[in-house]
Amino acid sequence: MSSAKLGSASEDVSRRDANYHPTVWGDFFLTHSSNFLENNDSILEKHEELKQEVRNLLVVETSDLPSKIQLTDEIIRLGVGYHFETEIKAQLEKLHDHQLHLNFDLLTTYVWFRLLRGHGFSISSDVFKRFKNTKGEFETEDAWTLWCLYEATHLRVDGEDILEEAIQFSRKKLEALLPELSFPLNECVRDALHIPYHRNVQRLAARQYIPQYDAEPTKIESLSLFAKIDFNMLQALHQSVLREASRWWKEFDFPSKLPYARDRIAEGYYWMMGAHFEPKFSLSRKFLNRIIGITPLIDDTYDVYGTLEEVTLFTEAVERWDIEAVKDIPKYMQVIHTGMLGIFEDFKDNLINARGKDYCIDYAIEVFKEIVRSYQREAEYFHTGYVPSYDEYMENSIISGGYKMFIILMLIGRGEFELKETLDWASTIPEMVKASSLIARYIDDLQTYKAEEERGETVSAVRCYMREFGVSEEQACKKMREMIEIEWKRLNKTTLEADEISSSVVIPSLNFTRVLEVMYDKGDGYSDSQGVTKDRIAALLRHAIEI
């Protein structure tokens, strides 16, 4: 508990304190700048030359389909597929022939299946049946093939028993073989067993795979070099955007004005970069980074520091969405309110109106109001002692987890759709958005409920499930992990069924879910970013790849 007083906060109120650590970065990203592109026109020329070479490799006609499948997959895994979206789509459409696999070996079939399903093509898992023996069992001891099989199984949907068998078979085999494997296959397998490619942050997966591919004797030199140069060029761009975000953060001086809250602007950028890293979305990342920076300040105010009376005043001010409302909230909250309105005004002026889609700002504001309402309900749970049912808790937490909001804001920021119906559809929390939000909630609660209980919280998915169904803590946690797998299968299914209206939601839903999987894989990597999160941010945003 804390009795610290901020602004006009009441002196006689005992306040909680989550004891979040200060930023691990200090002013590093405020001043850091890559010199990779400085006075180096030759790098830009080489990049363009290599890009054309890789494009030629991709589009050249060949009867060697296994090699073309492998090349397409490597281009994507190396993180350079965004340069060749049209060419890759054309190749995948050619490969989407249900009879092709009859001529493929095990390894090629597994890669082909994952590649096509991963891009929304419907492929039956029955293609795996011909690789079973007369006893109906998978049988292969080849580590590379097992790795590809294991990766493919994570595209499964509900009811695909053959893929359930395959994941158990391949995982058991790979765990036994791992100590005997050498680089680079050992790292490929270790990475997959920890977080499979389909669930990994694509930029982080590329950073891991670039040195692995570079060590393969069969690598294509031009592709390997192109991936390294492209990574470093993109890193320089991201550093520039993060530097601007850090400057904005420092100007508002959030850390000193709100010392109880998480100071995580770099971690927020890592989150948004994981969701969409491509250069053409720089403006969108700028806006979303500010949103993901300020949203936890609000969350921590409701969850940790504010009284029920104070947060209720803030909720009312957000509902009014008027600068004049700042006079009706405690002084310490005013910097959040001012920053919040400024973010959305900037978003409207520089991104939304510039595209002639001014109606989007109403969706953006409404979804932000919605998450504040959900924080209000959670504050009421704590301050009144109310314990919601499991379903009631989950219904509210789908919103408070933030993924519906971030998916809709990312849709607006990307601006890749023309139909207003897409925003209307996403706003109803369809299965795709719901699955992403539920995965986020289960993962979050599993990693944070004990820490929250230490500061007085009693409401979480784990505790609500225990209370309602009369099970132990261990059983409830096991159920949450099972639900994560169920919702992943549902998310996979909905992405395969996407139509004109919902197709724009696929990438935001998948990528935000991937970020959560990675950010919380070893604990709450956002709140406590001193360990693996710091290392991952450094790998993506600090350290260039040696060429």
Curated annotation (Swiss-Prot):
Induction: Up-regulated by methyl jasmonate. Mg(2+) 2 binds at residues 299, 303. Mg(2+) 3 binds at residue 444. The keyword Metal-binding applies. Belongs to the terpene synthase family. InterPro entries: Isoprenoid_synthase_dom_sf, Terpene_cyclase-like_1_C, Terpene_cyclase_plant_C1, Terpene_synth_N, Terpene_synth_N_sf, Terpene_synthase-like, Terpene_synthase_metal-bd, Terpenoid_cyclase/PrenylTrfase. One of its GO terms (biological process) is diterpenoid biosynthetic process. It comes from the Eukaryota. A motif (DDXXD motif) lies at residues 299-303. Changing residue 110 to S: Restore guaiene synthase activity. Restore guaiene synthase activity. No effect. No effect. No effect. This is Inactive delta-guaiene synthase. Keywords: Magnesium, Metal-binding. The Asp-Asp-Xaa-Xaa-Asp/Glu (DDXXD/E) motif is important for the catalytic activity, presumably through binding to Mg(2+). Its cofactor is Mg(2+). It holds the Pfam family Terpene_synth. Site-directed mutagenesis and 3-D homology modeling suggest that the structure of the N-terminal domain is important in facilitating proper folding of the protein to form a catalytically active enzyme. Binds 3 Mg(2+) ions per subunit. The keyword Iron-sulfur does not apply. Mg(2+) 1 binds at residues 299, 303. One of its GO terms (molecular function) is terpene synthase activity. Transmembrane segments: none annotated.
